[in-house]
Amino acid sequence: DYLKDNAWGYNRVTDQTVRIVSLYAQNEWKNKKWGILIGGRLDKHNLIKGLIFSPRANLRYNPSENVNFRASYSYGFRAPQAFDEDLHIDNVGGTVSMIRLAKNLRVEKSQSVSLSADLYRSWGDWQGNLMIEGFFTDLADVFALKEIGFQDGVLIKERHNESGARVFGGNLEGKVAWRDKVQVQAGLTAQNSRYKEARTWSDEGGVEAIRKMFRTPDLYGYLSASYNPIKRMQLSLTGTYTGSMLIEHHAGFIDSNKSVETPDFW
């Protein structure tokens, strides 16, 4: 993957070549009640010293045809490289801001565990499904942005490593269908996203050190419904809910930088 970007007016040139060679293997054993999957991927990334091994495992148990339990584990990483969003040039309170990578940016690593239960049921012409899931992710050397000041009139945000973060919570999803006419599906997620150590997002005095991650609501969900009155016609209704979240409010309209909670919205 080759990425080259020249922002002529802002004295920024991005010239990056990414080469990844991967080897993937997995083995699965299953019968009607049990399923076990074990696998792993070996990656060689030209921006990372050495090889990275990413294991994964999945365990399934079906006590009956209508009940399905799962447990899974996975490991992942993000390389210290420029991503598409790093090329965006933002306007913050009338001031242009850009992202750059810290010189000593390290690999971000993650380990995730999840437990889930799927329940299925039929009542005549009706079918239903309920899924309950709990998840936990531990991030080491997690990427984060921090304002470090102005350079040639441009506000510089630097992507660097924090010590780590944890994300955990649960999902609840349900689906109900009547024949091939009506289908309703809804889901709700409650989660907690926190850095392991409090951090500030700006060097400006007065910005409080916090652990909560920005732009990560603790509650969000969705709803979708469809109705097929005739074979070639479908009526659809969709909606999403996003709970309150913490964001950075930059100086300009207000006197100084501060962190604020947004209202929830549909």
Regions picked out by a protein language model, each given a short descriptive name:
Residues 2-6, 31-33, 40-46, 73-79, ...:
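Transmembrane beta-strands of outer-membrane beta-barrel pores
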Residues 2-12, 48-54, 82-88, 95-96, ...:
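Outer-membrane beta-barrel translocator domains and adjoining extracellular loop/strand segments
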Residues 14-56, 60, 176, 181-192:
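Surface-exposed extracellular loop regions of Gram-negative outer-membrane beta-barrel proteins
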Residues 19-25, 40, 53-59, 69, ...:
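Hydrophobic, lipid-facing positions within transmembrane beta-strands of outer-membrane proteins
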Residues 30-35, 129-138, 158-251:
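Gram-negative outer-membrane beta-barrel transporters
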Residues 35-37, 58, 62, 68-72, ...:
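Membrane-spanning beta-strand positions in outer-membrane beta-barrel proteins
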Residues 62, 70, 104-168:
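Membrane-embedded beta-barrel scaffold of Gram-negative outer-membrane proteins
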